[in-house]
Amino acid sequence: MFDVTLLILLGLAALGFISHNTTVAVSILVLIIVRVTPLSTFFPWIEKQGLSIGIIILTIGIMAPIASGTLPPSTLIHSFLNWKSLVAIAVGVIVSWLGGRGVTLMGSQPQLVAGLLVGTVLGVALFRGVPVGPLIAAGLVSLIVGKQ
């Protein structure tokens, strides 16, 4: 039996390799392995918890310099005194807010998820982006189409 989904995943993985984006390639290869093995029974759990776990891992990576001491407290304090750092703080707040709207939109309008995923994979693979795009993209879409 011909598996169109597997073919799409292989194509996206190839796109990841061609564009030298190991994040996309490895992620898709892991999903292919899950799909073609008995691990496929975990897909409902991955679909339900994967985003939360990914955000936790991303947050750990972002907070690691503070926890390790690489980013000293004095630097954090000075970030409130430099205009560029204040801009970075404001942008961080806005992007976090957009991500929150994105999570809501993805839950309430699942028909938009496919477009967001394709756009994110293309952005990661072709433009060396990072796969945090679906949440922010969904947040931007929510500003245009509404949360509903």
Curated annotation (Swiss-Prot):
Provide GO CC annotations from the record: plasma membrane
Keyword annotations for this protein, in alphabetical order, are: Cell membrane, Membrane, Transmembrane, Transmembrane helix
As for membrane topology, the entry says: Multi-pass membrane protein
Instruction: Please verify whether the record's keywords include Transferase.
Output: no
Q: Cellular location of this protein? A: Cell membrane
Query: Mind telling me which Pfam families this protein's record contains?
Result: DUF441
Source domain of life: Bacteria
Span-the-membrane segments of this chain are: 14-34, 51-71, 86-106, 121-141
Q: Which family does it belong to?
A: Belongs to the UPF0756 family.
Stated name of the protein:
UPF0756 membrane protein YeaL
Q: Which organism is it from?
A: Escherichia coli O127:H6 (strain E2348/69 / EPEC)
